[in-house]
Amino acid sequence: MRRDESVARQQRFATAGEALTYEMASTAARAASEMFATDVTLIDLRGLVSYADYFVIASAQTERQTRRVAQEVIERMIEKGHRPRTKRLDEGTAWISLDFIDVVVHIFTDEARDYYRLESLWRSALQERWQE
């Protein structure tokens, strides 16, 4: 997402809390992207569910890369003062889930992402492809 789009989007937030959760999602997306994760997507769940404001979904080519992307996301979020509440790995780490309460980050291998298809479950939600 380009900076001008990000600024315009932030102006649409009703509260400072909404702007903060979007910044958290952006931090996670940027970290994943910089670790060469592909197809990074932000899903805006505000008003649809009570357990999170955003999902950040990213793909990695290998299980090793999913772990490295997850480590980078955690480090960047901690730098911003946000620690993960939980970290869940499926068998073989093809899917890593990081729960930062208002933002949940899902890092998949390409095969796992095709199998679980989270974006299609939330097709009614606003979805943005991360681009820098």
Predicted feature residues:
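Active-site beta-strand termini and strand-to-loop segments that position acidic
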Residues: 98-100
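Structural motif
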Residues: 102-104
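Short hydrophobic/aromatic beta-strand micro-patches
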Residues: 57-59
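Long, contiguous binding/interaction regions
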Residues: 1-47, 61-68, 75, 80, ...
